[in-house]
Amino acid sequence: MTRETLIIGGTVLALVLGGRGAKAQGRTPAVAAFTSSVDMVRIAAVVRDRKGRFVQDLTARDFEVLDGGQTQPITDLQRDVAGVSVAVLFDVSGSMEGHLPNAREAATHVLSWLDLSRDEAAIFTFDTHLDERTPFTIGLRVLPESIAHVVPFGATSLHDAIAQTARRVGEREGRRRAVIVLTDGADNASSLKPDEASAIASSIDVPVYIFGIVPSIDNPSADTSTRSIEVAAFTGPLADLATWTGGHVFVASTPGQRSIAARQIIAELRHQHLIAFESSGKPGWHPLVVRARSRDLTVRARSGYIAGQSRPTAHQEDHHVP
């Protein structure tokens, strides 16, 4: 098991923090400082019809890509690629006390929908540190024994953990990649804001799925007011974080909801269209809009990328705790 600090900033990751705030308010996610150029941009896009059904038999002519408001020609579109690669990220901070059994159940559902022959998963946990419990493994079906014995403790660096895990998943080239976060939505120790974490994940095209673990509304012992506060944690900035990356938020309070959400996440990854186009070349953050030419279809994809800044320099690597 490896453990990494979740201090992201200064000499550890050297972030240049740009505009903050929600995309919906006309502001852009913060930008991380990187050095090498980006020539080809790849986008994972999920398409649905008006009934919410997946649409997968599209060609490049069926899409339109706007890079900074300018239409860009699509140079490649693929649907048949290698398997799924997911990082399952457990929140094991103090606020998750009482929630971990449900989080473990949700993770087991996720693993059950993977293809044993080609899909891979890795298991991570975090409080104020990120721990790798299981490296990326094809055919993973069972959670590591250590997850069953974790005692929730400490503060929560949710946004930092998401950004750092996304970078790990980003190394899994040629796969349908995602971070799946099992959390109650609390964050009281991150150095990154939600939009800053989202910018890092979005820039490397790793969708983030937030799997909200909350008390069951059917549980008569659940405090209704407390539950309302916990559900509210998954709206606003945290929902923006997921949406900007092309992911989604699922709030699951029952075993049935957790099973359905897990199945939907993996199904979305399997139905991605992988679109490629040439970057316009201007350094910095590029807002992206990917849409279908048919008004009967809706597309979900990441909100942008960083041109001229695709890879961290050597002094920007994550710090490993001895």
Kindly give the residue locations of the regions a language model identified.
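N-terminal export leaders
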Residues: 3-7
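Bacterial N-terminal signal peptides
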Residues: 9-18
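Scaffold/interface architecture of coatomer-like assemblies
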Residues: 21-322
